Amino acid sequence: MLKTIIFDLDDTLYSYSDLNEQGIKKICKFTCKRLSLKENEFYEAFNKAKKDVKEELGENVASHNRLLYCQKTLENLYKNPFSISLEMYEEYWTYILDNMKLNEGVLQLLEFCKKNKIKIGICTDLTVHIQHRKIRKLGIDKFIDAIVTS
C-alpha cells in the first residue's frame, strides 16, 4: 500500500515556466519605465546578472533568489542597487502569485491522497519563503504534510 507521495511544485502542480517568463517581462516594463531604459538594455543586464549570480553562488538556494538578480541587474546598469531592486522583486512575485493556478486534476489527486491517508510531501527548489507563499496561494497547504526545499 502506498504510504507517501512526493511532488515537485513548479511545473508539476502548477505551470511555472510561462509565469516566470511573463514575470520577467513585468520586471522589464517596470524597470524600463522607472529608469528610462530600452528593453534590450534591461535584458542584457538581467541575463548577465542571472548568469553572474549562478556562477558566483553555484547551484544552491541563494542562486535562485530573484532579489539577487534584481540587485545585480541594477549594478550592471550602474544604478544604485537599493533604488528599486526590492520593487522589481515584488513586481515579479506579485505577478506570479496572482496568476498561479493548479494544473488540471491536481486538486482531485491531493484530495484522493488525503482521503486514502497517503502522506503528501513537496520536494522543490527556490527559497523556502516563496515556496510557502506559493503553496498557500494555491490553497493546497492543508494537504501538504512535509516540504523539502533547496
PLM feature segments, named:
Residues 1-7, 12-45:
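Active-site neighborhood of HAD-like aspartate-dependent phosphohydrolases
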Residues 13, 117, 139:
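Conserved functional loop/turn residues at catalytic and ligand-binding sites
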Residues 23-28, 46-50, 70, 89-93, ...:
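Hydrophobic alpha-helical core bundles mediating ligand binding, dimerization, or RNAP-core interactions
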Residues 33-38, 77-81, 139-143:
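Short helix-capping segments at alpha-helix termini
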Residues 48-90:
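A metal-dependent, Asp-based hydrolase signature
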Residues 63-68, 81-84, 90-120:
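Short, acidic loop-to-helix structural element flanking the phosphoryl-transfer center
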Residues 98-101, 121, 126-150:
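Substrate-recognition "cap/lid" segment bordering the active-site pocket of phosphatases
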